[in-house]
Amino acid sequence: MPNETTSVSKQGENVCFSIADAQDYQPADIGINPRGTSSKEKDFNFSPGLTIADGKLCIPPSFYHFPDEGQFVVEYLLISKKYDDAPRKFVVGVGVGYGKVYNFPLTDREIARPYGSIQVSE
């Protein structure tokens, strides 16, 4: 299953991720880790209690307080009752600085891309 990625924005104090074609998908787990954290050291919450509303998954500071600056890799799995055999995994590079949040490009080690989308030099 290739990973999806999406845009990040700040809405009030919340950090929000746009979810295209959200349907009835909801988060089953989420990991927010500083960029460069090894796979073994990543921390995941398997009952996040977060919901997708209006095509956005928003993380309030009461769930995770992003510091004033840094880069984070946010990973989450969305599941659907209607499409229970088609979970969706997202990996998003989130940068924080100067009171704003922004996307940064992920490396091939940070995200699994669909076969054929990786450019290979000949």
Across the structure, where does each feature detected by a protein language model lie?
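N-terminal non-catalytic regions of secreted/periplasmic and cell-surface proteins
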Residues: 1-38, 88-122
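Extracytoplasmic/surface-exposed domains of secreted proteins
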Residues: 55-92
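Short, flexible coil/linker segments at or flanking structured domains
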Residues: 3-5, 18-20, 47, 54, ...
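Assembly/interface hotspot detector across virion components, adhesins/toxins, and nucleic-acid enzymes
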Residues: 8, 50, 80-82
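Surface-exposed coil/turn segments at beta-strand junctions on protein surfaces, enriched
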Residues: 10, 52, 65-69, 97
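Solvent-exposed serine/threonine-rich low-complexity stretches and specific carbohydrate-binding patches
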Residues: 39-53
